Amino acid sequence: MITLTDLFCGAGGSSTGAVQVPGVQVRVASNHWQLAVDTHEENHPDTGHVCADLSQIAPRYYPRTDILWASPECTNHSIAKGARKVVPDLFNPIPDEAQERSRATMWDVPRFAEVHRYSAVIVENVVDVARWHPYQAWLIAMDSLGYEHEVVFMNSMHAWHLGDPAPQSRDRFYAIFWRKGNRRPDLQRIQRPPANCEVHGPVAAIKAWKTGKRVGRYRQQYVFRCPEVSCRGREVTPAWLPASSIIDWSDLGTRIGDRPRPLAEKTMRRIQAGIDRYWSGQERDPLVVNHVSGSDSTRSTSVREAAPTMVAGGLHASLLVPVEGREGKAPQSVAEPYRTQTTRNETGLLTPFIAELRGGGSTARTVTEPLATATASGTHHGLTTGKSTSIEDARFRMLSPDEIKRAMAFPAEYRILGTKRDQVRMSGNAVTPPAARDLVAAVAASLEGAA
């Protein structure tokens, strides 16, 4: 049995992924927020739990394990840090202590590693931690403790190695450390998602950086290419799970024209932009908001622009619309992965008003073939052809905490405690289980080989 410590465990995404690897046991999990610890214990009752500010506790208090997983404070590294600090709360205030100290610092990783001499360490953070000024000093500190390392930049929608990925585009930084002299984990294998090449058909895609600087996000700094030499680096798009797979289609929301309070002006503009672009032709394709921080926001995309490996299925003429005030947020197909989930609920669901959808007895239907990798949940209705849908006749609602939980790829039975706001926050802070699963699997395989 390979044992693992999960520091800054939050709601338990990293632990949930780790225990999906055969032979791996999470021995202890720790976080400073009691509600997060309670949530973790609710779902992982066989794990030991410690509620503590990790920057203020002695590492010797914790048992030694084979692997350390750590997800230190990411707020000060994120490009979203520049956002206004006061954000209207959709439900109720977050506890002050959780607001001020969501996680401990990156320096707690070498502090714990110095005491416990873990066989391997995995550190998760936002992509921009690689631009943190003490980043190189932090790596040197781990090197001085006897570790070699490899840094992986991975999007959770590409974590296909041991199962389905997350239905969400979520770029993250992962630093993997192993003891000098131990076997190097095969991290390249887990970064080859399935794709479809126009020439060679199904392939295991290879990552290709656009420049010599290997730091960044999918599409912005790297893409995937066909591995066959004869293709001469033909770009391919990996398969993904659509956002439609996490939406409860039995709840269509309220007709916009019937809402007692109008939606915000920016939200209405985004809805109208999506309708004008995608619902003005013969087919009203489903759309979803792709809400990415920073200036390089992802463009709106129709489901008909999907990669050949993703066959449209289980789709709905719908929009997910961001409701927060920042510019540059655009609608995108629900056949695309869900946008990166933050700690706030900022995404709404818009569906066209179709009479047959008002009843509860409609059977599941799709517009084309079903997805090869997954089917959408709930009841579904095929798209219709016709003229542009009026904005007043469309239905709109916010995504529920349960839908956001599923967008993070937590199991359906996973229980996240607290208020709706607490649940959204814990989901947004979590590690997606598929990414943790694949990374822990690679590390565990290297340790078994060494043994």
For each predicted feature, which ranges?
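SAM cofactor-binding core of SAM-dependent methyltransferases
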Residues: T5-Q56
